[in-house]
A protein has these predicted regions:
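Amphipathic alpha-helical substructures
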Residues: 390-470
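Extended, low-hydrophobicity, Ser/Thr/Pro/Gly-biased non-transmembrane segments
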Residues: 114-222
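Acidic/His/Gly-enriched intrinsically disordered linker/tail segments
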Residues: 340-399, 403, 407, 426-427
Length: 529
């Protein structure tokens, strides 16, 4: 029985692995001392045995001398050798971590670590939500490979510092070798393609900072369909679609759909973030993921109509993450709503642009109805990807932006939202938490928005509005659980009035029963006395 168990674990290491892996959380002090500057990932990918083999090189800076270096790598992959600054080092690989002790001490400053490794990586159980590798085939029987690892972290296939607070500031190189006839779609620019003895090597390079979970590649029998795109700032960038050969006829229309999305996203969030490289999408066997400059797309061209034109919700949402996740990145998974909620708000903004304000309002009303409100959006600090993840970080996060728009007004809200997406202090090498967003919008508003942020992001409470009829035609209205006055639309017999209401009751005159916040700008509870 014991021997059978060992064999089972060796042959099928992926059964429970992905569900047990988490990304982020409390940052290990030894890893906090490491500033990752650059990754080089060189792998041979063999679909016939579902294996990877190669090495990782990490350039890093130590803030102070260290007794050891610590990297993350799943146990199902085997470390073969490790070198630090060209010298072979001893190591220990346990609990999904690699520990590299120094003979005496690693000096502060620059270090180069090379880790040779390989094996059969974890299989994605339910990609992209429970991630890992997918070894699929297209309808013609060709290998079709994808990686998704947002929840688990990139440690599912390469040694890394698995925490959202640190990205390789100087970018990354991916050198991926696959059987000849297949193509590799990766991040950044394709610098070199070479062929040798039945294998093809694709060298992808990005000079931008990039999240670990976006540092992935896709493999398939792809055809590259491309065009030039002129950004809102007048810059030319290549728009590329790595489409399965069997779906190549769909590619041009799909790029039309993508281009419409890009125009709207640039309008609200500023120029496409990666103009020095490309706009990229790759067809994948899973639904999709926001992999930087090579978004994963697997919605099978299931378009709906928006403004009378083809629209793909999945394509638009994942592409919106180029701004919200890839350019503006949460420092701690606890604040994941910044990436998912604001990106989801971008899903509503394209409805506004293509179908009008009324359609946008209806969408946000439906979003309000869909909010579960079982857990706060922000549940604490230094929590991992699994602890923070639930549906409301999307919908309720988006609805909170809708509320902010109403409270601030369009003249303040939209420029401030664009500033969050474009100001260097919030973007690229810099990461953000909720306090940064609150401070930015409060400064723009001229008053503290802390009570509003606290109520809707840190609790599951709804805005409580007290309504009391004090006379035949008079009503007293007050806000019970918010320590700041806010505008509220009130419908009376003479029409709709926008009135600023706080904890002190306001008297409203109306011959008919009043309606409070009829268009639903707040998640609220009305209490009638």
């Amino acid at each position: 029985m014991r021997r059978f168990l060992i064999i089972t674990l060796v042959l099928f290491p992926f059964f429970s692995l992905a569900q047990n892996l988490r990304s982020g959380g409390k940052l290990d002090p030894e890893q906090a001392n490491m500033d990752i500057r650059h990754y080089t990932i060189a792998l041979t990918v063999d679909p016939s045995v579902q294996s990877i083999d190669g090495y990782l090189e990490a350039d890093l800076i130590l803030a102070k001398p260290a007794a050891r270096l610590v990297f993350d790598l799943t146990q199902v992959l085997r470390v073969k050798k490790i070198w630090v600054n060209g010298k072979e080092h001893k190591y220990e690989h346990r609990d999904h971590k690699i520990f590299i002790p120094a003979a005496a001490s690693f000096a502060a400053g620059k270090q180069k670590v090379k880790i040779a490794y390989g094996g059969i990586p974890a299989i994605a159980e339910r990609a992209p939500w429970i991630g890992g590798f997918q070894w699929e085939k297209d309808s013609k029987g060709n290998p079709w490979i994808a990686i998704s690892c947002q929840g688990e972290g990139a440690k599912v296939f390469f040694p890394c510092k698995d925490h959202p607070s640190d990205e390789p500031n100087e970018g990354a190189d991916m050198i991926i070798t696959v059987p000849k006839g297949l193509s590799v779609a990766g991040p950044g620019l394709l610098k070199k393609l070479s062929h040798k003895r039945g294998w093809s090597t694709f060298h992808w390079k990005t000079n931008y900072t990039i999240s670990n979970y976006c540092l992935v590649f896709n493999v398939g029998k792809y055809k590259l369909v491309s065009r030039d795109y002129i950004t809102i700032e007048g810059n030319k960038v290549s728009m590329q679609f790595y489409v399965l050969e069997e779906n190549a006829a769909r590619a041009e229309n799909h790029l039309d759909v993508l281009e419409r999305s890009c125009r709207v996203l640039e309008k609200y969030f500023g120029e496409y973030p990666w103009v020095k490289e490309k706009i990229g999408i790759a067809e994948t066997p899973h639904l999709g993921m926001e992999h930087q400059t090579m978004n994963a797309y697997g919605n099978k061209y299931q378009y709906t109509k928006l403004g009378g034109q083809d629209f793909d919700w999945l394509l638009h949402h994942e592409f919106g993450h180029e701004w919200w996740a890839n350019k503006v990145t949460n420092r701690d998974w606890a604040h994941m709503w910044i990436q998912e909620g604001i990106c989801s708000y971008g899903d509503a903004l394209i409805v506004r642009d293509m179908d009008g304000e009324d359609a946008y309002i209806k969408r946000m009303q439906q979003t309000a109805r869909n909010c579960q409100n079982k857990l706060p959006i922000v549940q604490g600090e230094e929590i991992d990807s699994d602890q923070t993840y639930h549906g409301d970080i999307y919908g309720k996060g988006a609805f909170f932006m809708h509320t902010l728009r109403y409270v601030l007004g369009d003249e303040i809200f939209f420029p401030t939202l664009k500033k969050l997406a474009t100001d260097p202090q919030y973007t690229y090498d810099n990461t953000v938490i909720t306090a940064d967003v609150e401070k930015l919008f409060s400064n723009a508003y001229g008053k503290s928005l802390q009570p509003l942020f606290h109520l809707f992001l840190y609790t599951t409470d709804k805005l409580e509005i007290n309504i009391r009829q004090v006379d035949a035609d008079k009503y007293s209205i007050s806000v019970v659980n918010l320590e700041m006055p806010i505008p509220i639309d009130i419908v009376t017999d003479t029409g709709t009035k926008r009135i600023t209401i706080g904890s002190k009751p306001e008297t409203i005159t109306s011959q008919t029963m009043i309606q409070v916040d009829p268009k639903v700008y707040y998640l609220k509870k009305l209490v009638y006395e």
